[in-house]
């Protein structure tokens, strides 16, 4: 029997039923009609679709360097504090391990991520990809970058058909993401985004929303629209034990949730060709929130293997649990930590998540954010919980009032109306 949750909407006598893989709207229904629909959904069969492509793919994430040319006021990794880069031989051992672990894999899904600016040591990055190309038929390059690279770097990303996530805070860039010298980085990043878009690059923009910028989401959207951005992710600034900056940078979760709803409505009502990834609305499922608990394998400049980029140094809090191995002469995995991380699931999370009506959408929120806020054992984050409980009923209600909102929120919504 399927688990089904019932979410009451702001519209009277209207509900959303969620079960893994599906959202069902019940509009203007009686209590008996609601109970009948719940029982019917509980008794439907689960459609299990096997993704055969996974059998031929493996993945690896790399933090190429801790060095960074920006000094973002909220940096989760305090990038630029050190300038050491990963050793190419460490990377080769990791790539060899991934090939040996799954010899049938023809595709390597390779992520270049921060700790610093991944593309700053461009020669090293090219050497990494060239080696991966020798072992795999196809290497999919995924990059999270601050977007300050040279034309040579941008052209390489275009030629590699990379999936590019550019961190750009738009109207807040000068205040929040200056160069290490203090110079404004806005124009160089904006121009690089325009260049990538003009060459049909696969690009999305990520905006970090602070207490300074939470009231400027519409201004951000207008600038992104003007330069042709089609996909943006709004990410709240969540300060941690290792990030740069003051706790006051974190926005009020209630204001953030309200402004998120407002900007989605603005995009829908003004026919702006922009999709918004909120991180707070997703296809209902029952798995782990992210790969931290289920397979993340990220190598660091210290030759460590971490399950989360927010813990990338051996001396950082929770590294004794979040690090899953190290690379010396070979890859050495910590099976105890791997087993521990598998338990980072909302069903094991303190705070009532296992009974919450939003659990299939929220999945308990980012486990590392929960740990930063509350330590261990895993306990729900109040920030995430407040946002979800304000945002979801509002946005689910507005979806039935304005179907354009669905197109802003999700590419292929699994929604039924009854």
Regions found by a protein language model. Name each.
Residues 1-61, 104-105, 418:
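N-terminal [4Fe-4S]-dependent radical SAM core
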Residues 30-43, 299-334:
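A broadly conserved sequence feature marking short terminus-proximal activation segments
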Residues 52, 65-66, 344-348:
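Short, flexible, mixed-charge glycine/proline-rich loop motifs
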Residues 54-90:
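Canonical Radical SAM [4Fe-4S] cluster-binding loop centered on the CxxxCxxC motif
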Residues 92-113, 121-237, 249-251:
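Radical SAM/AdoMet-radical enzyme domain recognition
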Residues 177-190, 194, 198-293, 298-306, ...:
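Radical SAM enzyme [4Fe-4S]-AdoMet core and its adjacent flexible, acidic
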Residues 315-418:
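Flexible mid-to-C-terminal extensions adjoining Fe-S/redox cofactors in radical SAM and related proteins
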């Amino acid at each position: 029997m399927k688990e089904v949750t019932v979410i009451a909407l702001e519209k009277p006598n209207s509900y959303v039923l969620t079960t893994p893989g599906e959202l069902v709207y019940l509009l203007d229904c009686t209590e008996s009609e609601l109970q009948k629909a719940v029982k019917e959904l509980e008794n439907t069969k689960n459609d299990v679709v096997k993704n055969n492509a996974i059998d031929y793919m493996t993945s690896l994430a790399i933090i190429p360097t801790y060095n960074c040319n920006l000094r973002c006021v909220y940096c989760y990794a305090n990038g630029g504090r050190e300038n050491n880069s990963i050793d190419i031989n460490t990377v080769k051992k990791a790539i060899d391990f991934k090939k040996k672990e799954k010899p049938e894999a023809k595709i390597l899904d390779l992520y270049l991520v921060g700790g610093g600016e991944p593309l700053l040591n461009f020669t090293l990055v090219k050497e990494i990809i060239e080696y991966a190309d020798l072992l795999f038929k196809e290497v999919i390059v995924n990059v999270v970058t601050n977007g300050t690279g040279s034309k040579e770097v941008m052209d390489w990303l275009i030629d590699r058909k990379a999936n590019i996530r550019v961190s750009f805070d738009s109207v807040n860039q000068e205040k929040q993401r200056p160069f290490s010298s203090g110079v404004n980085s806005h124009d160089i990043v904006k121009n690089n985004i325009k260049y990538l878009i003009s060459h049909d690059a696969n690009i999305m923009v990520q905006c970090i929303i602070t207490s300074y910028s939470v009231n400027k989401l519409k201004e951000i959207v207008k600038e992104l629209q003007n330069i042709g951005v089609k996909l943006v992710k709004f990410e709240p600034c969540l300060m941690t034990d290792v990030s740069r900056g003051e706790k006051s940078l974190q926005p009020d979760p209630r204001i953030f949730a309200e402004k998120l709803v407002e900007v989605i409505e603005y995009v829908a009502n003004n026919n702006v060709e922009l999709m918004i990834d909120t991180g707070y609305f997703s296809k209902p499922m029952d798995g782990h929130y992210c790969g931290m608990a289920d397979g993340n394998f990220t190598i660091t400049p210290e030759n460590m293997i971490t399950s989360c980029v927010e813990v990338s140094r051996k001396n950082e809090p929770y590294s004794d649990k979040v690090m899953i191995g190290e690379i010396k002469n070979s890859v050495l995995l910590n099976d105890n930590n791997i087993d521990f991380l598998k338990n980072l699931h909302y069903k094991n999370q303190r705070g009532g998540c296992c009974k919450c009506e939003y659990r299939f959408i929220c999945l308990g929120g980012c486990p590392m954010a929960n740990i930063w806020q509350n330590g261990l054992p895993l306990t729900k984050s109040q920030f995430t919980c407040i946002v979800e409980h304000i945002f979801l009923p509002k946005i689910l209600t507005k979806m039935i009032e304005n179907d354009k909102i669905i197109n802003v929120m999700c590419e292929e919504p699994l929604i039924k109306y009854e």
